Amino acid sequence: MMFRLTSVSCFLLFIVFLNLVVLTNACIPEGTYCQFNADCCLSQCCWGSCGNPCRFPGKREKLQEFFRQR
């Protein structure tokens, strides 16, 4: 009886641990690709990447981004 109780306890503890891992990895950090505001941890999804606050890029920033992608 004790073995069964221990096995069930370990199994339930494992399930709780997996749920915690999923909850802690639910958001993505700033600067990574996103589709919705809910994807970002504390940021907003701006033009496909997490940023806080949303930055409106100027000509120089757009040009630098163009060269970074090359």
UniProtKB/Swiss-Prot annotation:
Task: Give all Proline amide modified positions.
Answer: P57
Task: Specify the signal sequence span.
Answer: 1-26
Q: Name one GO cellular component term.
A: extracellular region
Kindly give the PROSITE patterns that the UniProt entry links to this protein.
I_CONOTOXIN (PS60019)
Predominant cellular place of this UniProt entry's protein: secreted
Has UniProt tagged this entry with the keyword Signal? yes
Mind listing the UniProt keywords for this protein, alphabetically?
Amidation, Cleavage on pair of basic residues, Disulfide bond, Secreted, Signal, Toxin
GO MF assignments: toxin activity
Copy the domain comment: The cysteine framework is XI (C-C-CC-CC-C-C).
Family recorded in the similarity comment: Belongs to the conotoxin I2 superfamily.
Know the name of this protein? Answer: Conotoxin Lt11.2
